[in-house]
């Protein structure tokens, strides 16, 4: 089994009300508009949300992966997306926890994890076997960190206007 794992976790204080922060993070169009490498997100008739993400890896180049996720939790404390039932190859988990600091300030704890599983490296990309799991995982970690940091920066700017 050829497995690539990557993730990123961070915490940020946003000078906006809990209600506005939750509303922002509940709207998936904000992810498409503000998170780099997200090419599209759509929800099908069965309630499964499909994220299409571009992955750039040195020595290999760019490739696109689709992640099917479902909303596991959405309330005033937390939003969590988990892999859709039956998904075995492209696993994406995203969560945001909301902690009010004051009436006009909210702390948000982010976590995004991705896992790509293939029976053989060539199923992921013809050159994946040459790069190996650790190099690709390391580059994906950098990519996810960059995606989330950029998204959080843009979200903070928009919410604090």
What are these regions (language model features)?
Residues 1-50, 161:
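Hydrophobic ligand-binding cavity/cleft-lining segments
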Residues 3, 62-64, 132-146:
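Low-complexity, charge- and small-residue-enriched intrinsically disordered regions
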Residues 5-11, 48, 66, 78, ...:
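Intrinsic-disorder/low-complexity, polar/charged segments enriched in Ser/Thr/Lys/Arg/Asp/Glu/Gln
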Residues 11-15, 42, 70, 97, ...:
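Generic structural detector for well-ordered beta-strands
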Residues 17-23, 139-147, 151:
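Short amphipathic alpha-helical segments
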Residues 18, 43-47, 72-77, 97-107:
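A short, structured loop/turn motif at beta-sheet edges
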Residues 43-89, 146, 150-161:
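Glycine-rich portal/gate segments that line the openings of hydrophobic small-molecule binding cavities
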Residues 84-142:
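Beta-strand/loop substructures that line and gate deep hydrophobic ligand-binding cavities in soluble
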């Amino acid at each position: 089994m050829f497995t690539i794992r990557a993730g990123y976790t961070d915490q940020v204080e946003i000078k906006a009300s809990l209600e506005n922060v939750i509303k922002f993070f509940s709207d998936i169009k904000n992810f498409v508009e503000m998170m780099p490498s997200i090419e599209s997100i759509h929800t099908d008739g069965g309630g499964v949300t499909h994220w299409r993400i571009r992955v750039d890896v040195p020595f290999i180049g760019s490739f696109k992966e689709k992640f099917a996720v479902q909303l596991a939790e959405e309330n005033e404390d937390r939003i969590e997306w988990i892999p859709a039932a039956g998904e075995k190859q492209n696993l994406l988990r995203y969560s945001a926890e909301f902690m009010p600091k004051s009436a006009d300030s909210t702390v948000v704890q982010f976590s995004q994890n991705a896992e790509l599983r293939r029976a053989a490296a060539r199923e992921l990309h013809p050159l994946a076997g040459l790069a190996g799991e650790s190099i690709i995982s390391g580059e994906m970690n950098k990519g996810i960190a960059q995606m989330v940091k950029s998204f959080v920066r843009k979200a903070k700017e928009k919410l604090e206007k």
